[in-house]
A protein has these predicted regions:
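C-terminal catalytic "cap/lid" subdomain
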Residues: 1-161
Length: 161
C-alpha cells in the first residue's frame, strides 16, 4: 500500500510523494525458470526475505527508522534461549540499544529461518544509518522510544561498530 498525496500517476509515484506509511514486500506467485533445451518452464523454490526487503525499502525511501515486528518481544540472547526453555522462563533480551557489531556477533547463534534474518537486517540498517527495532507488533511505539524490544542503533562515526 502506497499512500500518495494525489491520484496515482507516473509523476506522483516517487517516495517523495508519500504522505503515509509504505507497506509492501512479501511472497506470492510461483517463480519459474527456463531450463536449457526445454520448451517449458519449471517451478523453483524461492522465498522472499521480508526482512531484507523491508531494509531495501527503508533505504530507498530514506527512512530514519525500520521496525521488524514479530511475535517475539525482543531479540533474545541465543546463549540463554535453551536454558530459559528448560527452566520455563523468558530468555534474556539482548541489551538495548545494541550496536550493529554486537548483533552481528550473534548471527551464527540465531535460528536460521526466524530471528537471524531480522537481526541481520537490523544490523545492516544501523550500518546504513537507520535505527532498527525488533519486537512485537503491539509494542511498536515503545520499541521506537527504546522502552521495549531491541533497538539497533548506528554508532558514532558511521561505521556501525
Amino acid at each position: 500500500l502506497l499512500a500518495l498525496d494525489s491520484a496515482p500517476s507516473s509523476q506522483s509515484s516517487s517516495p517523495d510523494s508519500c504522505v503515509g506509511p509504505v507497506i509492501c514486500g512479501g511472497g506470492g506467485g510461483v517463480p519459474v525458470v527456463a531450463r536449457g533445451g526445454s520448451t517449458g518452464l519449471d517451478a523453483v523454490d524461492a522465498v522472499i526475505d521480508k526482512d531484507a526487503t523491508s531494509l531495501l525499502l527503508a533505504s530507498l525511501l530514506g527512512a530514519s527508522a525500520l521496525l521488524l515486528l514479530t511475535d517475539a518481544e525482543a531479540l533474545y540472547d541465543p546463549g540463554d534461549w535453551e536454558a530459559s526453555r528448560r527452566e520455563e522462563r523468558r530468555p534474556e533480551a539482548v541489551p538495548s540499544p545494541a550496536s550493529p557489531g554486537e548483533v552481528e556477533a550473534l548471527l551464527p547463534l540465531l535460528p536460521e529461518g526466524s530471528m537471524r534474518p531480522k537481526a541481520a537486517a537490523a544490523a545492516r540498517a544501523a550500518r546504513e544509518g537507520i535505527v532498527a527495532g525488533i519486537g512485537s507488533l503491539q509494542d511498536a511505539a515503545e520499541i521506537l522510544m527504546g522502552t521495549k524490544g531491541t533497538l539497533v542503533v548506528p554508532t558514532r562515526g558511521g561505521g556501525g561498530g
